[in-house]
Each structure stands twice: as C-alpha cells, then as structure tokens.
Amino acid sequence: YDIRIPVDMNCKTIEQKIATLVKEIAEKRGVEAFYSILDETEPFEAAHNSPLVRAFTLGIMEAEKSRPTLIRKTGTGDMNVLGNQWNIPVVTYGPGDPHEAHTIDEKVSIEEYLKGIEILKKTLQHLKRLHDKKMQ
C-alpha cells in the first residue's frame, strides 16, 4: 500500500499506528501477522508566504491574468526530500492538469508548454526582485 501522510503527522507516528493495529488484529484472530515498510518520505508543505511561493503566484498572475489556486500535492517527490532535508521552501509546478499527472491521460499541449516557460521566466524575475528587496 501507498500511504499519503498529512503534513501534521510524521512517518514514525504512522508506523506506530500500523504496528498497534497489526498486533491487535493478529491477537484478535489468533494469527501471526507481518508487515514491512519499504520506503518512507516525510510530508512537506512550503509556507504560502515564502518568497518562492509568492514569486510563483506573481509569475502566474502576470502571465495568466488571473490568480492561481494553490493545491496540496500529496505523495512523495523531490519537493518532500529537498524541502525537509535542506529546510527550504519548495514548490511543484508544471503545465498540464495535475490530476492527470502520471496517468495514461497525462498530456501537455505546445501552448501549455510555452506558457509554462513564460511563467518560469516571470517567476524568476519576481524571485530576484523579492530577494533584492529583502537584502536592502
């Protein structure tokens, strides 16, 4: 099974809950039960007021002429690993429908791809401006 851990919990808490449940069920049914954890990645969520999130929001607003909707991406990825390991804000961004990511229906049009490049350019400009402003 693939368990998605909410950001207000951690892997150790989930492991303890699993161990307790497995033990209770095994005792109740009079059987031995085993499980193994093959991999784990702590949950991560960047602060919505971080300069990186702000820069992306501004870049998208400038390119799309509308305010983006921030969504919580559950699961594992570079964002979880880098954000937790380095204690830095990290976002996942890309063109296309995020609900179709890694499915048979995943696709990106040329128009979306080019718009994504424009958004990244504008985001980097805003990130530099926000960084320079903070350094003053």
Whereabouts are the PLM-identified features?
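Metal-dependent amide/peptide-bond hydrolase catalytic core
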Residues: 2-136
